[in-house]
Amino acid sequence: MENIMTLPKIKHVRAWFIGGATAEKGAGGGDYHDQGGNHWIDDHIATPMSKYRDYEQSRQSFGINVLGTLIVEVEAENGQTGFAVSTAGEMGCFIVEKHLNRFIEGKCVSDIKLIHDQMLGATMYYSGSGGLVMNTISCVDLALWDLFGKVVGLPVYKLLGGAVRDEIQFYATGARPDLAKEMGFIGGKMPAHWGPHDGDAGIRKDAAMVADMREKCGPDFWLMLDCWMSQDVNYATKLAHACAPFNLKWIEECLPPQQYEGYRELKRNAPAGMMVTSGEHHGTLQSFRTLAETGIDIMQPDVGWCGGLTTLVEIAALAKSRGQLVVPHGSSVYSHHAVITFTNTPFSEFLMTSPDCSTLRPQFDPILLDEPVPVNGRIHKSVLDKPGFGVELNRDCHLKRPYSH
């Protein structure tokens, strides 16, 4: 009988943060909203807070960047480490070091599903179905997958069963789809700038933006509109129809996450041929099952927020059983290793984090080292052929560890 590899146990889990409310803005990293001045991502973009004039001009004005980046590292008893980043900051550090550590340390590095289930169960009474706690659990889960891959010497996508395609093709999210086209992306997703409080004038302005970009990009380049939970059903329906003449491919996250009936109605009333998408701010498999039942066309979980890679794999299987697509929200290498194994993810998202969208900057810069970016809008699977997620932690980022155990 052949020898079976003996896997080590997890000896330590540690949590750091960078950025957040007490830091100078512009730390970047896992909290990619934390950018410096004159950045498109902090421009006049429609949000649930836009109806308040004091908070409509900038997303940082209402505190979108107060959490900062959470970094979780797990260390095996043989000294190997895995890590991941997400958006949870100092509060996420507390949850990891003071609560979740008991479910991690002492377990085998392969006990990812067991640890995941225990973290979900133990936090259920204070986590709800998403938000800060789910971001933290996601970060731990991703760190565990990174460690497991490094211990066995395989990239995460091979742990999931291997690639189903040779490369990932991307659309770009940012303010300049025309520049994205020049870089080889298959499409560009723009932020909506106006909402229900702006009335029909807001609809006309955003439709005019789409029309202008259609003229610049030509008839075949995909154009999409990201509404970031800022609308109601009536406004979103009107906006979708106003943009239909310009061949808008989809309209995204128009409504708050829990408005499932609203999504059902929006899908029913959207223009023929225009897709309705959402899921970025949903967490847990159960919430995605409810979202899937609304009939939307694409579910868009963020692997750093939805429950981690373990949950993302479950969401993809759920969507596949219903004939729906899963196109994760951003998330760089943490998504790349997943989507290249999903048959119902024919393309993926690349988030433009350069201030004016004129250059390709890694999404989680500067916290990750060796983070790949698309070349001509694509990443070949060979780029992912490194153990774990294939990136390293930049320890020059002044990591802060506020708690220990």
Swiss-Prot record:
Catalysed conversion reaction: L-rhamnonate = 2-dehydro-3-deoxy-L-rhamnonate + H2O
Cofactor info, note text: Binds 1 Mg(2+) ion per subunit.
Cofactor(s) needed by this chain: Mg(2+)
Keyword check for Metal-binding: yes
GO BP of this protein: amino acid catabolic process; carbohydrate catabolic process
PROSITE patterns in UniProt: MR_MLE_1
Catalytic center residues: H329
Amino acids binding Mg(2+): D226, E252, E280
Name under which the protein is recorded: L-rhamnonate dehydratase
